[in-house]
Curated annotation (Swiss-Prot):
PROSITE patterns: RADICAL_SAM. PANTHER family: 23S RRNA METHYLTRANSFERASE (PTHR30544), RADICAL SAM CORE DOMAIN-CONTAINING PROTEIN (PTHR30544:SF5). The gene is rlmN. It comes from Leptospira interrogans serogroup Icterohaemorrhagiae serovar copenhageni (strain Fiocruz L1-130). Binds 1 [4Fe-4S] cluster. The cluster is coordinated with 3 cysteines and an exchangeable S-adenosyl-L-methionine. GO terms for cellular component: cytoplasm. Residues 112-341 form the Radical SAM core domain. It is found in: Cytoplasm. This is Probable dual-specificity RNA methyltransferase RlmN. Reaction proceeds by a ping-pong mechanism involving intermediate methylation of a conserved cysteine residue. Disulfide bonds join 119-346.
Length: 353
């Protein structure tokens, strides 16, 4: 695995951030060093949050010079930081190389001092065209590397001076289109010797990449899993999510059922409410039937963008739709939209200020 992310060419320094302990051990051996050095670097990066070799005070000058020459501790640059009236903060990052490619992460405090969530990106832009999502309007510029995913959390926590209790892969991009780097980053978040977040506090979301879901099941990944459903009917879903062309709703629901059966864990369906598109009695009834067929919960999310003349549902419309879903007998959460005033709410990440 070492060679996968050495850089754009073999003359680049080896990035060490975003590496698992096993990978760091392999790198140290490749460099002619003892494997225990990997544990020291791993602890320094993820527990002490070191960003320069000078901070590794127990390392000899010769060893630090060697690391400086061959390896990098590259970290993200914050090019913009916006704070909402509700305490949510949005961070726009670019890589240390200064390539001009920007992506975003959002710090979402609960307000009561309890839950503190970081919503992170997995790609720069997105290849999919979910019509309610601002990120879909951006040019796709590639997958984020593991260290760019991990460092979103490290940099946000450093700036806000607090630690996240939860991490959600619900920012820019389709996480399962960057499976390797997303799972590697999640494993670092989960590792007790790194960020030490419980698996149930890490949520990976997908628009419905069925082969990625099956890979997730096969690998028995321990993390929470969410599917962006948004319509209970294949034809209706195709009108708002082009992924329906490749992975049909019946295929997706079968994968979801296999997930709950084989991993024995509940799955979350996310449902962006769009008046006149996917709400009303008929759609609610179909969604109830889906929910009754497997172990799930439903997160309903008011539309935050205004494409195609669509509008955000009123409180009354939201309450009415939720009431129609109650016969499903599953947990239903009306997810609030923090950070809407800074374009940091669900579906709004597009580097807009």
């Amino acid at each position: 695995m070492i060679s996968e992310n050495l850089g754009e060419n073999q003359t680049e320094k080896i990035p060490l951030k975003g590496r698992t302990l096993k990978e760091l051990s392999e790198i140290m051996i490749t460099l002619g060093e003892k494997p225990f050095r990997a544990k020291q670097i791993y602890h320094g990066l993820y527990v002490n949050r070191y960003e320069t070799w000078d901070q590794f005070t127990t390392f000899s000058k010769i060893f630090k010079e060697k690391l400086e020459e061959l390896c990098s501790l590259t970290h993200l640059q914050v090019v913009k930081q916006l704070k909402s009236v509700d305490g949510t903060q949005k961070f726009t990052f670019t890589s240390e190389s200064g390539n001009g490619k920007e992506f975003e992460a959002v710090w979402i405090p609960s307000g009561d001092g309890g839950r503190k969530t970081i919503c992170i990106s997995s790609q720069i832009g997105c290849t999919l065209n979910c019509k309610f999502c601002a990120t879909a309007k951006l040019e796709f510029q590639g997958n984020l590397k593991a260290h760019e995913i991990v460092d979103q959390i490290l940099q946000v926590e450093k700036i806000v001076g607090d630690k996240a209790t939860n991490v959600v892969f619900m920012g820019m991009g389709e996480p399962l289109h960057n499976y390797f780097n997303v799972i590697r980053a999640a494993s670092i978040f989960h590792d007790p010797d790194a960020l030490n977040l419980g698996a149930k506090r890490i949520t990976i979301s997908t628009s419905g990449v069925v082969n990625g879901i099956r890979r997730f099941i096969e690998n028995k990944e321990p993390y929470n899993f969410a599917i962006s459903l948004n319509h209970p009917d294949p034809k209706g879903r195709l009108q708002i999510m082009d992924i329906e062309e490749k992975f049909s709703l019946p295929e997706l629901l079968q994968a979801a059922k296999d997930f709950t059966r084989e991993l024995k864990r509940r799955i979350t369906f996310e449902y962006v409410m769009i008046p006149g598109v996917n709400m009303g009695f008929e759609n609610a009834n179909k969604l109830v039937k889906i929910a009754k067929s497997l172990d799930c919960k439903i997160n309903v999310i008011p539309l935050n963008t205004e494409f195609f003349g669509w509008r955000r549902p009123t409180r009354e419309e939201i309450a009415e739709f939720i009431a129609l879903l109650e016969p499903a007998g599953v947990p239903i959460l009306n997810r609030r939209s923090p950070g809407k005033d800074i374009f940091g709410a669900c579906g709004m990440l597009a580097s807009k200020s």
